[in-house]
Amino acid sequence: MALLTILRILLWGVVLFMEQRVQMAKPGWPSTALLADDPTLPSILDLAKEAPGKEMKQWPQGYPLRYMLKLYHRSADPHGHPRENRTIGAKMVRLVKPSANTVRPPRGSWHVQTLDFPLASNQVAYELIRATVVYRHQLHLVNYHLSCHVETWVPKCRTKHLPSSKSGSSKPSPMSKAWTEIDITHCIQQKLWNRKGRSVLRLRFMCQQQKGNETREFRWHGMTSLDVAFLLLYFNDTDDRVQGKLLARGQEELTDRESSFLMRSVRQACSIESDASCPSQEHDGSVNNQCSLHPYKVSFHQLGWDHWIIAPRLYTPNYCKGICTRVLPYGLNSPNHAIIQSLVNELVNHSVPQPSCVPYNFLPMSILLIETNGSILYKEYEGMIAQSCTCR
């Protein structure tokens, strides 16, 4: 009889809370029907998809790699945590190297290469927000000193030279004095990015011998196209992904209210029926065995991923372990289902398993990696580091 009374009170509590939910279904409150997909779930599988496999080309070297390493260290700490004061302005940056280059016959003191950059606009979850070309405006070689610039083969393309010390109005850029950067966002977005299939950005890299060197015959011998120019593409989350994160935060607020309401119902039921076999933490063992977060570190070398992940070297995913007590603590933010499941296990049917200790909140992680085609990618992956635990 006491058990039936407890369950009856709990069911009435659920009904009352659902009525409160209906009243809250007004502007300013996220609809629970839209909260099915939680975008903060761990994305380690998304990271694994980036693995280039054995067909990966040679490990990048030289200035492009140094550029991306400096960009990474400005945007993330040594553990891969995105810095709060980062100025990169994007969740993902891809360094694209030329897929082909053609040396043109010299015209007087001018020496020209054409560089082709492949563009794949299949980033469904991301939108292109910025595109720049970084190139060497000075070439100091043995017996040669050249001044260089780039031109696009895109009609009516507007470009904007960026100061060597900046990458935008107030964003520092990891550039040396011999390199400069131009903004070609308009060219890419308006002329090339929305085309079906693959597009190619073609640039002319033009260098002029300085006075006094014209008599010597200049050749591009020993210089790769990546030594003179590369393309940077900046991406951000689409509106749908941002909206999904806002909805997820609203879901957490609702879950906290639900858990608090149901836990009060449990205590009220037990106080009314004092002779009932109420759930108690006294039988749940040591407090040290309760569900909690445990630190853990692993290197990408141990995972076999160090041949394509440049930085960081270590990964601290953490893990959740412990007993989900019969009365779930409020601080665990357990959902209604876990609270009811725990009560059913204790009071009604022991064959129903108790909730499991699993991660609840996650932190993102910034990773610098090499793609199959040799491009270098900086990307912030959501849900990589467990920050807290819950019972579900």
UniProtKB/Swiss-Prot annotation:
GO terms for biological process: positive regulation of DNA-templated transcription. Ovary specific. Residues 1-25 form the signal peptide. GO terms for cellular component: cytoplasm; extracellular space. Glycans are attached at N85, N213, N236, N349, N373. Keywords: Cytokine, Disulfide bond, Glycoprotein, Growth factor, Secreted, Signal. It holds the Pfam family TGF_beta. SMART domains: TGFB. GO terms for molecular function: cytokine activity; growth factor activity. Coiled coil: none annotated. Belongs to the TGF-beta family. The keyword Lipid metabolism does not apply. This is Bone morphogenetic protein 15. Disulfide bonds join C291-C357, C320-C389, C324-C391. Homodimer. But, in contrast to other members of this family, cannot be disulfide-linked. It is found in: Secreted. It comes from the Eukaryota. The keyword Zinc does not apply. Residues 26-267 form a propeptide. InterPro entries: Cystine-knot_cytokine, TGF-b_C, TGF-beta-rel, TGFb_CS. Its main location: secreted. May be involved in follicular development. Oocyte-specific growth/differentiation factor that stimulates folliculogenesis and granulosa cell (GC) growth. It comes from Mus musculus (Mouse).
